[in-house]
Amino acid sequence: MKIHPTQSSALNNEHDKASRSELARRIARLGEAKFVDHDISIDQQLLGGQPDTLFIPTGTIDLSTARKLGIQTESQIYGGVVPFPFVGSKIITHSAFGDDPPIPAGWHHELGLALAPHVLSGWSAFTLDAVRAAALDMLGRTAIRLKEVEATAGLGQFVATSVKELDEAMAQLDEPAISKHGVVIEENLDDVVTYSVGTTRLFGEAISYWGTQRLTTNNSGATVYGGSTLHVVRGSLERLASLGLADELQQGIDKAIAYDAIVSRIYPDLLASRRNYDVAAGVTSYGECRIGVLEQSWRAGGASGAEIAAFEALARDPGRSAVTCMSMEIYGEVDAAPNGSIIYYSGVDPVAGPMTKYVMELE
């Protein structure tokens, strides 16, 4: 078996590449496989895909690419295959506002309606006019958050509580990117806890987990993703849901399971061995408590290192049923990882600056 992380123009900073390579090495070791570095060309991959090859793409891949790579089942990928590229993005979480004409081919209007009970209030839009109209529709009821679809790690988001702030936020949006990928307009929450709820299947084994995300400040002063702590059990999301956890957490798990089932029903060609959902719980600007799924991740992500550490711990002890693992991203410091941790990156990234990324088993 060989591991091929596929190439992408996104997530291509030095620390991203190093993290993907370390992740692939550890997955290869877990499956007693050969690791092939991410510098392999896509042409070589298209010629060399075999049933025993496991692909680790940077993002979700579409059906056409999956067929060229020989991917037919989720056991051949750590990540996901989607019928249309937009299905792998946060844009599917909400209905399109109005009769927005640039809605992409393959868009199902019933999806947003079906997901509505399980997500925050919001809209998706594909033109500046639609973004503004949707935002004005919501501003009378709540503060809003604009989210660029292609942005990751908490970047590309703007909060507006007034028309003036909306205009300032919209001035930062890229119109060609809106036409291509869309923008999410969503109610903004304060006092937010962001949960990670997910399941991953690798080499015939399955884990599921709930966890919390932490935020940090990057070297440019922006608030970004800083890591996750995952509480992992063997088995499916349904097994996780049966544990009788605290009410808010249970709601989050149930909503993630519903989101997963609805998208899988409407897009039956979806394949995903990694199904991770961000769930936010917080308070609206009018004091209402809200909880809902923000987005899906069917690709290698920030919490992937913690997931693989959990697989490793459970493989070492077949009688063990649960484990807690943590991923951490620290900006401004090199060699900040504690003893006993698994280092994914430690150095000075030419773009992101000095940083350390590591994973630890906690208990």
Predicted segments, located by residue:
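Short, charged N-terminal beta->alpha structural module
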Residues: M1-D39, W107-E110
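Structural motif
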Residues: T6-N13, I56-I61, D99, N188
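Conserved N-proximal alpha/beta basic substrate-recognition cap immediately N-terminal to
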Residues: F35-L139
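Active-site nucleotide/adenylate-binding loops and adjacent lid/helix of ATP-dependent enzymes
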Residues: T93-V183, R201-E205, T217, T229-A261
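A short catalytic or substrate-binding loop motif that flags glycine-/basic-rich loops and adjacent residues
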Residues: E150-A151, N188-V192, D269-R274
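Phosphate-binding site of ATP-dependent enzymes
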Residues: D167-S228, N276-V293, S297, G301
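A long amphipathic alpha-helix within ATP-dependent nucleotide-binding catalytic cores
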Residues: A222-C289, R316, R320, T324-V359
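A short alpha/beta connector and helix-capping loop motif
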Residues: S304-D317
